[in-house]
């Protein structure tokens, strides 16, 4: 092989705006999936309740998400993030049409990071409660309740999975916006 052959290369036929447009389409797709994950988590947790049947109608044990302020915060946080993601779809579509927009990408990075903090905070706090529901804490006499409230625990655990998946998707959105901005600054 000759040394000159290595220097000869073919230029990419993909334009830089085409790559940015592809990244913007991926951004839109990820936002839609994140909406589904966070909204599904809010709905699943918000409709979680279970009543244990007993011999008498006067004594009933009931578990509802609203009994725990942490779960209420989880539902509100996921609902806020879902609403934000729906509103941000407009900017995501704008970026498909105008791939060189910088100010709106910076705004999206800022708001995506704020929503990531809110979503992760709600999911992490609820994860601690779900862990206690599954495992308990013998030192403080908090016994596991998931043997009795099986459906309640399955729904809350599933809600956490959707919420943490939404967190990962928002991290990807932040990376995509940062990459698109860095590609634009390198071109100027």
From Swiss-Prot:
Record keywords:
Cell membrane, Cell wall biogenesis/degradation, Glycoprotein, Membrane, Transmembrane, Transmembrane helix
Q: Where are the transmembrane segments?
A: 25-45, 73-93, 106-126, 160-180
| Entry membrane topology | Multi-pass membrane protein
Nuclease listed as a keyword: no
Glycosylated position list: 49
InterPro entries named among the record's database cross-references: CASP/CASPL (IPR006459), CASP_dom (IPR006702), CASPL (IPR044173)
- Recorded family membership: Belongs to the Casparian strip membrane proteins (CASP) family.
PANTHER family this protein is in?
CASP-LIKE PROTEIN, CASP-LIKE PROTEIN 1U1
Protein name (database record): Casparian strip membrane protein 1
């Amino acid at each position: 092989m000759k040394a000159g052959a290595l220097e000869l290369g073919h230029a990419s036929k993909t334009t830089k705006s085409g790559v940015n447009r592809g990244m913007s389409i991926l951004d839109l797709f990820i936002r839609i999936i994140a909406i589904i994950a966070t909204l599904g988590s809010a709905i699943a947790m918000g409709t979680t309740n279970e009543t244990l049947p007993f011999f008498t109608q006067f004594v009933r044990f009931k578990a509802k998400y609203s009994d725990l302020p942490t779960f209420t915060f989880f539902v509100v946080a996921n609902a806020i993030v879902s609403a934000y993601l729906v509103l941000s779809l407009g900017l995501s579509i704008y970026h498909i049409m105008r791939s060189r927009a910088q100010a709106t990408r910076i705004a999206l990075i800022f708001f995506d990071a704020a929503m990531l903090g809110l979503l992760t905070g709600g999911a992490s706090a609820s994860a601690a409660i779900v862990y206690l529901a599954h495992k308990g804490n013998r030192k403080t006499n908090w016994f596991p309740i998931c043997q009795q409230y099986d459906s309640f625990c399955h729904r809350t655990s599933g809600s956490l999975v959707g919420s943490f998946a939404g967190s990962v998707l928002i991290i990807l959105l932040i990376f995509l916006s940062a990459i698109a901005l860095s590609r634009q600054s390198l071109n100027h």
